From Swiss-Prot:
It is found in: Cytoplasm. Belongs to the TRAFAC class OBG-HflX-like GTPase superfamily. OBG GTPase family. This is GTPase Obg. One of its GO terms (molecular function) is magnesium ion binding. Gene3D superfamilies: GTP1/OBG domain, P-loop containing nucleotide triphosphate hydrolases. The keyword Magnesium applies. Residues 160-333 form the OBG-type G domain. One of its GO terms (biological process) is ribosome biogenesis. Its EC number is 3.6.5.-. Keywords: Cytoplasm, GTP-binding, Hydrolase, Magnesium, Metal-binding, Nucleotide-binding.
Length: 391
């Protein structure tokens, strides 16, 4: 299945149904009171995280999703039916962003987590609501309010503990194959990896971590060179980054310069990502003697002024790979992921009584000409129907 990690869709919540103007008409009751019902609320739009999905390909071609409109009110005090909600399933790790305002609406990081992204409109009021002692036959009603509509940007960000960085052909996919059961494509040409992939590295019988491999970066990737830097977003949720460096590049480039290229592109993308713990891992030491590899690495880190720990491995032969995975596991256990507590639902600020009061103040007449069944001569709220003559 094709990997799609971004999608732009149109979301439309349902409009609220309009109120109804109606009067009770039955046998022997030719002039009954008002009986127009309220409209129904519009349907909402939700996102729900589904662990069985791993791509946003479902939203590549189908771009518009609309919830059902609330039905209008009817006579006999019948309230309109509420519009049906729609729920869109997305992979775990999806972020929802308002395309116009760039506001982050929420992150779905757990299976089954649900996010309201468009609220349906509220119902209009029927003329029964406007009945009073001085207005026995109201012809006012209110219209339903529009539902929320927005262009929604969906971004899938993989959930991994460890993220791999490096130039093309640094050996990232080979490392993934060495530490996990994942089988990403490996070849001797650049950009063998075209989409992110995940692998589960097991350390012992009861410990493991998830590692993410992304396509390699090249110089000026932030300006669109190569595959660009768009895949770096998949590393934002990682706890540690592994910067894999080819100690003996085939193009005879300087490994120190190659490290600087990745560092620069990382800062160009996000300072927050660049501030994550990052380990230098020198790969392909099997292409030279141990003494030569050690001397070359020491010369590189001295030029860079790098003072943190670094590692020398061969992903192809597995040399020192087990030691590295144990160190990674120990680091992850010492720095557990900050668990995001489920926030309590916001208190509902919407009050029906307030809404009804405001709606009644902005009511519209069914007819252009105002009409009621009271005459200007009414005295103390009593309409004079017949007055008997003199003696």
């Amino acid at each position: 299945m094709k990997f799609i990690d971004e999608a732009l869709i149109r979301i439309e919540a349902g409009d609220g149904g309009n109120g109804c103007v109606s009067f009770r008409r039955e046998k022997y009751i030719p002039k009954g009171g008002p009986d127009g019902g309220d409209g129904g609320d519009g349907g909402d739009v939700y996102l729900i995280a589904d662990e069985n999905l791993n791509t946003l390909i479902d939203y590549r071609f189908e771009k518009r999703f609309a919830a059902e409109r609330g039905e209008n009110g009817r006579s006999s005090d019948c309230t309109g039916k509420r519009g049906k909600d729609i729920t869109l399933r997305v992979p775990v790790g999806t972020r929802a962003i308002d395309h116009d305002t760039k506001e982050i609406l929420g992150d779905l990081t757990k299976h089954g987590s649900k996010l309201l992204i468009a609220k349906g409109g509220y119902h209009g009021l029927g003329n029964t609501r406007f009945k009073s002692s001085v207005n026995r036959a109201p012809r006012q009603k209110t219209m339903g309010t529009p539902g929320e509509k927005r262009d929604l940007q969906l971004e899938l960000m993989l959930l991994a503990d460890v993220g791999m960085l490096g130039l093309p052909n640094a050996g990232k996919s080979t490392f993934i194959r060495a530490v996990s059961a994942a089988k990403p494509k490996v070849a001797d040409y650049p950009f063998t990896t075209l989409v992110p992939s995940l692998g589960v590295a097991r350390v012992g019988s009861d410990r493991s971590f998830v590692v993410a491999d992304i396509p390699g970066l090249i110089e000026n990737a932030s300006e669109g060179a190569g595959l660009g830097i768009r895949f770096l977003k998949h590393l934002e949720r990682c706890r540690v980054l592994i910067h894999l460096v080819d100690i003996a590049p085939l193009d005879e480039s300087d490994p120190a310069d190659n490290i600087a290229i990745i560092e620069n592109e990382l800062f160009q993308y996000s300072e927050k990502l660049a501030d994550k713990p990052r380990w230098l891992v020198f790969n392909k030491i099997d292409t030279m003697s141990d003494e030569e590899a050690t001397a070359r690495v020491e010369e590189i880190v001295e030029r860079l002024g790098y003072e943190d720990n670094y590692f020398l491995i061969s992903a192809a032969t597995g040399k020192n790979v087990s030691e590295l995975t144990h160190d990674i596991m120990d680091f992850l256990e010492a720095h557990p992921r900050e668990t995001e507590e489920d926030k309590p639902a916001d208190e509902v600020k919407f009050k029906w009584d307030d809404y009804h009061q405001q709606a009644m103040e902005s009511a519209v007449d069914e007819d252009d000409d105002f009409w009621d069944d009271w005459s200007e001569e009414d005295d103390e709220g009593v309409e004079t129907i017949y007055e008997r003559g003199g003696n």
